[in-house]
Structures are given as C-alpha cells and as structure tokens.
Amino acid sequence: MVKLDFQPKLFSTLKNYTKTDFTTDLMAGIIVGIVALPLAIAFGIASGVSPEKGIITAIVAGFIISFLGGSKVQIGGPTGAFIVIIYGIIQQYGIEGLMVATMMAGVLLILLGIFKLGTIIKFIPYPIIVGFTSGIAVTIFTTQIADIFGLQFGGEKVPGDFIGKWILYFHHFDAVNWWNVIVSLVSIFIIAITPKFSKKIPGSLVAIILVTVGVYLLKMYGGITCIDTIGDRFSIKAQLPEAAVPALDWEAIKNLFPVAITIAVLGAIESLLSATVADGVIGDRHDSNTELIAQGIANFVSPIFGGIPATGAIARTMTNINNGGKSPVAGIVHAVVLLLILLFLMPLAQYIPMACLAGVLVIVSYNMSGWRVFKGLLKNPKSDVTVLLITFFLTVIFDLTVAIEVGLVIACVLFMKRVMETTQISVITDEIDPNKESDLEVHEEHLIIPSGVEVYEINGPYFFGIATKFEEIMARLGDRPKIRIIRMRKVPFIDSTGIHNLTTLCEMSQKENIHIILSGVNERVHAVLEKSGFYELLGKENICSNINEALEVATKEIAEFNKAKK
C-alpha cells in the first residue's frame, strides 16, 4: 500500500505567519503578477492560442501550484518550454486535443507524486536537459521570425516543423515589413538595457508599455497602419472563462498518450529544477512529491477553464524571491492580480504590437538557450556530447516528444555501458592479502587458496549487462576447478538476469561436479536470492559470511575429495 506523501507548504508556513510576512508577500505577489502578464500573453499567442488563455493559465495553475505546492516560493504558469509542444498538438489535434493531453499529463504528474518518483526525475542526465532546452530555444526563435519581419503568407498555413517553416520564410522574405523589424529591435534593446537602470522592473513590461504607446501614436498621428497588433488578430475577452470538459474517447487517449508523457516529463523537470534553484537561494528544501501532485492538479484543472500546460517558472520564481516573497501567499496574490487585470484591463492588450511580443520571446529564447553551458558540455566525454547533440537536433528538426524518448533511451544505454565498464570481475587462484580485505581480521599470514579452488571477485552490480561478462571470463580460463568461490561482498544489487546467470552456472557446475560457494552476500542481495529459490538449488550451507569462512569450507571439501580419491 502506497502511503500518500502530500504536505503543501502553505499550511505549514501559515502556522508562524505574521503581518510583516503578509506585507512582503503582498508586494512581491503584485510585482510578480505584473511581470507575469506580458509573458503569459506572449506564451499564449506563440503557442497558437488566444492571449487570454495564457493569462487564464497563469491564474488557475498559478493559484493551485502556490496553494497546494511543495515549495514556499514557486510561481507557476505557462512557460516557453511548452510552446513547441502546444503548437504541434493544436495543429494536429486541435484545441480539444490539447485539453485532453494536458489533463492526461496532469494525471501522470499526480501519479509520479503519489508513487514518490519526484527524486527520480532529478536524475535525468544533464546533457538531455540542456539538449532539449537549447532545442526549444531555437524553435521558439524560429516561430517568431514571421512577426519580427512582418511576413504575410496570404492564407498559406505555417508548417509545424522547423525545416518547413524556414522554407516558407525564405519564399516570402522579399516582402519584409521594416516597421516590424524596427519595433522588434527596439523592444529587444529596451529589454536588454532595463536591468542597468532597475533590477526590479521587468524589461519586458517596460518594452511593452513604451513600444505599445509609440506604435499607437504612429498609427494615430503618423499614418503608419502596417504594424499588426494583438487586436488585429484576436478578439479580446475581458471575462471569466466558462468551465468545459472535453469529450473523451479511447482513440484520442491512445493517440495523445505519448504527447501527454512529454508534457508530464517536461513539466516535472522544469518545476523541480525551478524549486531546486529557489531552495539554493532561500535556504529551504521543497517537497518534490507534493510539488508534482500540485503540478498535476493544476494541469488537470487548468484546461477545464481554457488553460494550457503549466509548470514552475524559474524567472518568475526568482522575481518573487528577489522582491521579498516568503511564502505561497505571494504566488496566490500573483494569481489574484492577474485575475483583476483580466477582468478590468484586458481590453488594453489589443494595442500591443505582435512584433513587440516577438522581441520579448527572442529574449526568452536567448536566455533559455544556455549557449555557454551548451558550449561547455561539448568538451565533456563523447558519450555526453552524443546525447546532447542528438537530443538537440531531434528537438529542433522533429519535436520534443521524439527528442525526450530517444534521448532517454540513449542515456539509459550509455549508463548501462558505464556500469558494465565500472563493474569488475577478478579471478584469484593463489593467495589473498588480509591487510587489503575489509571483511577480514588482519593476520600475519596471507590466506592461501588451496589447489583446485578458484575465487571470483565481483565488484559492482550483478545485472544483465555483467552476466555474460562472467560467463566469458570462465570460458576464457578453460580449466575445471573442483570449487568455485563467488565473492559478492561488493555487489550492491542483483537483477533477474543475474539470478538466472547464477542459477545456470550452479546447474552446469553440478553436472560437472564443480562445487559453488557464495561469499560475503549482503542483506539486500541475500533476500533477493532467497526469495528467488536459488538457495534451495545451491544449499544454504554453501553461503558464507566472508572469504575466510568460504576458504575453510573449500579446504574441507578438497580434503574430503582427496581422501575419497585415495
């Protein structure tokens, strides 16, 4: 029976909560809400949905993640990492397909948390994370080319794949709108220089306000009407969304399951990475499993109100910390601020230029790319570089689902290869030095291995990757000793293939009248072997606690054999 480990940080934090804490959380929440606004709009539009869906996601998912999450300062909402996935799902399955996939991902995240797999997510190889994060950054940048250059495709559908997009772009680069280019460059410039004047005011917000006002004045008094705004493409609704559950059918669930896994894995990685970074800054420890359950609930509920996939956002979480956020209350305030903006200020969003949002996303993609880290990993071992490059190019050329699946498979194969290389099997046929043995008392004389006895020392996991290696070593020796002592003091675990290998070895040895003795089996391996029935075949009298005892048994066996021979 799995015991539910669900302990939201909000409830433990409120036990010693003060008015001062509330004041700082209130101010931090307001600032984070303002920071989240342009990003939520930009991520929503870039994902292929309306701007208010991005804000709704930040409200609903942001509230749930703060209310039920396992981190004190985590801020949840839509992120750039999901843009590529969402855009692809909508193109192939439509909005309803996105809703189903997101809700399925929510269920998967809840299960990951219930079965306490939060810590395992952290062990996904770093090259895979960097590879697909950098790949996503390139893809996000690619999706913004049309708005940066003001390209018009005359109703022609923009392909979902990387190569298809660039082919379409090149066919229309003869009709660049230079006003769009100027707006994008000015936006990027403002975002880049704002931190030099103020660390607390987000550059993206400053850029959107200044550029929107500038473009509005150009349209009103300069006669410049060729700069597209949000209002030119979307109908802005300043109202609460109605709850709606998508129609579910088995065929859709089967088709969308791989995509749901991708959303869940990516959401888990990004949220736990964000929470871990936050821990390092505030000196706290988040609860990974509680965080995953909260993320799952958020992703299950958000689509019902028209939201898209959400996760913990590192940039907004750091903004929360830097502005004094101390508890999940700040995240709840951030959601309330966005709700008020949605209800009362949303009509103003129609004046925001699309080229300005493209500039915001160019900065997002640059920050996400982590090109310095990527460059540094290229100096690592070839196996890591292989995983990095394959994951990166698969993300860019195909999609994130393929990249994560293939990247994880390659990482697993390389991991097994490394374990096989580190697991050593040595053969001792003469003597053992007690001064170098941790499971023996130190004696003056060396332990002599009797004639007709071979000692095999296994150092590392006894799993399917090493089982054949053991067989090859014995075959290479070619001789047939009277007794084989298999020393397993440094075997941390054994799998079913290892058990099968030992069983086969024991059966073959018995047919050849070769006696098998196990030495130094730890409690974990001992329990597995006993449960498998292997001890019934071998005989418990042939299980020795250390090599000294095993050699004593072997010496007696050899003496009895020689006596019987005479």
Regions found by a protein language model. Give the residues of each.
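Short, contiguous clusters of charged residues that form electrostatic/catalytic patches at enzyme active sites
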Residues: 28, 188, 192, 468, ...
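Conserved SAM-binding loop
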Residues: 75, 518, 543
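The feature marks cytosolic C-terminal regulatory regions of anion transporters and related permeases
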Residues: 367-537, 555-563
